[in-house]
Amino acid sequence: MKKRIVTIFSVGIIALSITACGKSSGDSSEITKKLDFDIIQENLDTAFKNSETYSIYNSCDIEYDSDGNDLNIIVAVNDSIDPSLSVDYAKYAISTINYEAQRQVEGLKDYSNSDNYYGGLFDDVDAFITVAPVSASNEDDYFIFESIPRGSNREIKLH
């Protein structure tokens, strides 16, 4: 009987430990529920349009799927862009999206280009980023086609 109680107690503690370790500093759904992705989209477009550095930008679209807590980022650039610059466009989009999320939710961590840390929003969502020329008709034509699992520091590379 004593062994059975100890076993049940041990299993309970292990289950609680696993559950506690799986939580981030904030519940993902609680963070993203506070965000207005339409405002983030508008401000991202404005940031690209007003930037002299990213003048070959054509459009950017973000789509958030709350069921999977997924964020899709699609940046369309003019066909004349040097493909090697598309990594800069991707990082600019990510840093701007995180900055706009920080304006809406207190406590999200900053983006850091030096160590491929994409910021607090990207700790809580799985992201997928595509940078492609406007003439792209299939995946083979994309410059960047990269997934960024939540909390990872995966480097963005050319496709």
Place the predicted regions along the sequence by residue.
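Bacterial N-terminal signal peptides that target proteins for export
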Residues: 1-9
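C-terminal motif of bacterial Sec signal peptides marking the signal peptidase cleavage site
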Residues: 17-20
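Bacterial signal peptide processing site
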Residues: 22-24
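Post-signal peptide N-terminal segment of mature Sec-exported envelope proteins
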Residues: 29-50
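Short edge beta-strands and adjacent turn/loop segments
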Residues: 49-80
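Polar/charged, Gly/Pro-rich intrinsically disordered segments
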Residues: 50, 106-159
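Mature extracytoplasmic domains of secretory-pathway proteins
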Residues: 68-125
